Every structure is written in C-alpha cells, then in structure tokens.
C-alpha cells in the first residue's frame, strides 16, 4: 500500500507557453489565482510534499511556499525534463507529476493511481480519460502521460533515456511496468483533464465544473 506521505507531488510549469504567446502559463489567472497556485492547492491534500518545476520567474513561484527547481536539461526539453528534475529532488518513494495547465484534475488522482500501482505491482501508474476524436467525434479513452505516478528508483533509467536524446514520455514509460487508470467512471468529472493551451481555452475552463 502506498500512503499519502509516500508521495511527493511535482507541478510541471517549465514550458515555453508558446501557444499562449510565450507567457509563463503557470502564472496566468484562473478563478482569481495563478494557475500553478490553484494546482498546488488542489494537489496538496493528495500528497505528502509538493514542489514546482519552473524555468522562469522563479521568485514568483517560490512565493507559493514550496521548493522550486528548474530543468537540469537545456533549452526547454519538455515534460520529461521536469520528470527528471523531480526524480532527482524527490525524497519519498513515489513522485506524482501534474501539469500546471489542467486545473480541474481529479481530487482523488493520487489515491487512484497509487491503488493501481499497488494492485498491479507497477513502477508507473498513468491516468487516462475520455476524449472525443476531432475527425469523427468518437469518444475514446486516451492516456494522459503528464499525469504519472513514478517510483523514484526509475531515476537511473530516465537519466539514460534523456542522455540518449529521448524526449517522448510514452517512449520511456513503455520500457517499464505501467498501470493505466481510466477516469471514466460514474461521478468522474468529464472535464477533469481539459487543459488550457491558449488564453481563450483558459477562460473557457473557468466556467466548467467546480469540484
């Protein structure tokens, strides 16, 4: 069994924000708070500790009261660079990654991923959620690879993968035992994994379910 205090949460806020015009996405306003702070408040009850991965405006993120660490890899290398930073700094057996731009993520995310990892003896547990295909509207359950519960012993594997030039999450996670948890049950918020890539999408998210 994985206890809450066995998990450190990592908020991924280190991206370029290119589709938002290059702004620091985690500091954009959502319901009166910076996105990353809203994410922090949603994540804190689910885990033992929290830290933030950011590459700009570090003092602003530090004002939220948790440790802030930039990427160790150069040139905005993507979410795996954040994973790597988190695993290097994590002092608990498990690390839970959450992006800063998906503010409605489930309040039981950590618990359900931890249950699946325990049940399946997996090194990774990854969220999945229903998504409508843009071409034909068909709803399929798709993995959400930035929502990952990772065993910290995976650090060495990720170092090797990134040193070899690997940058895609799924190419790395497929090398390990990975449990996939579908958040498509009755009572699950259908908007839980909606993310904001543009300011218009962020404003649209503000009007969705308050959970």
Swiss-Prot record:
InterPro entries with a match to the protein in the record: MobA-like_NTP_Trfase, Molybde_CF_guanTrfase, Nucleotide-diphossugar_trans
GN (gene name): mobA
GO MF entry, a single one: metal ion binding
Entry's EC annotation: 2.7.7.77
Cofactor dependence: Mg(2+)
Quaternary structure and partners: Monomer.
GO biological process: bis(molybdopterin guanine dinucleotide)molybdenum biosynthetic process
EC primary class: transferase
Protein name: Molybdenum cofactor guanylyltransferase
Organism for this UniProt entry: Acidovorax ebreus (strain TPSY)
Reactions this protein catalyses: Mo-molybdopterin + GTP + H(+) = Mo-molybdopterin guanine dinucleotide + diphosphate
Keyword Magnesium tagged: yes
Protein family (similarity comment): Belongs to the MobA family.
CDD domains: MobA
Subcellular compartments: Cytoplasm
Classification lineage: Bacteria, Pseudomonadati, Pseudomonadota, Betaproteobacteria, Burkholderiales
Binding site for GTP: 12-14, 25, 53, 71, 101
Stated role: Transfers a GMP moiety from GTP to Mo-molybdopterin (Mo-MPT) cofactor (Moco or molybdenum cofactor) to form Mo-molybdopterin guanine dinucleotide (Mo-MGD) cofactor.
Gene3D superfamilies per the UniProt record, alphabetical: Spore Coat Polysaccharide Biosynthesis Protein SpsA, Chain A (3.90.550.10)
Binding positions (Mg(2+)): 101
Main location: cytoplasm
Keywords associated with the record: Cytoplasm, GTP-binding, Magnesium, Metal-binding, Molybdenum cofactor biosynthesis, Nucleotide-binding, Transferase
Cellular component terms (Gene Ontology): cytoplasm
Domain notes: The N-terminal domain determines nucleotide recognition and specific binding, while the C-terminal domain determines the specific binding to the target protein.
């Amino acid at each position: 069994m994985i206890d809450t205090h066995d998990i450190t949460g990592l908020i991924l806020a280190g991206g370029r924000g290119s589709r938002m015009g290059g702004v620091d996405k985690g500091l954009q306003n959502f319901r009166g708070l910076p996105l990353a702070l809203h994410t922090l408040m949603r994540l804190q009850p689910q885990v033992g500790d929290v830290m933030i991965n950011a590459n700009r405006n570090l003092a602003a993120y530090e004002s939220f009261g948790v440790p802030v660490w930039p990427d160790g890899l150069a040139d905005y290398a993507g979410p795996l660079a954040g994973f790597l930073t988190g695993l290097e700094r994590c002092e608990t057996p498990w690390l839970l990654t959450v992006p800063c731009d998906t503010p409605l993520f489930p309040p039981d995310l950590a618990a359900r991923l931890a249950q699946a990892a325990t049940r399946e003896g997996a090194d990774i547990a990854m969220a999945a959620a229903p998504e409508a295909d843009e071409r034909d509207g068909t709803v399929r359950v798709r993995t959400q690879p930035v929502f990952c519960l990772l065993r910290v012993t995976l650090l060495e594997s990720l170092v090797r993968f990134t040193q070899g030039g690997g940058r895609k999450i799924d190419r790395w996670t497929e090398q390990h035992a990975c449990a996939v948890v579908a958040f498509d049950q009755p009572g699950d918020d259908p908007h839980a994994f909606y993310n904001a890539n543009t300011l218009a999408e962020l404003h649209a998210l503000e009007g969705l379910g308050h959970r």
